[in-house]
Amino acid sequence: MQYKTVAEAKDQPGLRLALTAGGPAPWSQAAKSIFQVKKIPYIPVAQHGGQANEELVAWTGHRNAPVAMYDNEPARTGWYEILMLAERLAPSPSLVPRHVEDRATMIGLSNELCGEEGFTWQARHLMFDTLLKAQGDAFKQNPMYTAYGYSAQNAAAAPSKIKPILAALSARLHKQQGAGSRYFVGNQLTALDLYWANMSQIVDPYPPEKNPMPDFFRQIWAPVRAAVESAIDPILIAHRDFIFAQHLTLPLDF
């Protein structure tokens, strides 16, 4: 992906999207997928994982990614507020169900994947545990080390929190399959399908020809898979592959 710097992008009109450059950071990839499906143009701005990103902080108030900046509106960093921005900018195709029960299901399960203490949050504890064991005190200098509640205790507890989320997702897909649907909610694509397609890379990454990420990511993601492999129902991976085949593009671009 061809990124702009903060200096190049900050005074431009429209949508600017700060994304983690150089690897398939799950939250960044998920945000990209939302805008891709809706065909919303944006200027990609490089955020560098594990670094201070001083210029990004000065512009947006945030060090991490993704950050959506639209015209002169406040920065948006949460998965839900980014999704709502996308829905406003391009109401069709909607990625949010119309019916309240379906919408509540989609938002709830999306938060289990993307929200604080959810699947990806817990997986990050395991990644940080791997990095701390490999790098020792050097990793403690990384600004991410103290930003997301990592501790050895939280890392140890993470698998027991991830597995029920995977179980809920797979149960949902089995129920939908029985009703004749290939999607998590209803009979059409929603944001939840896109979130899982991207977050699933943590526990079952595509091979290099589809996901040409640095080996570093495979090394820190492998322990996550090992810790929760018993909960990875094949229907979850089949669903991920279907979503990429029908709605997204490969190889991943970052």
Enumerate the predicted regions with their spans:
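GST-like fold's C-terminal all-alpha helical module
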Residues: G115-F216
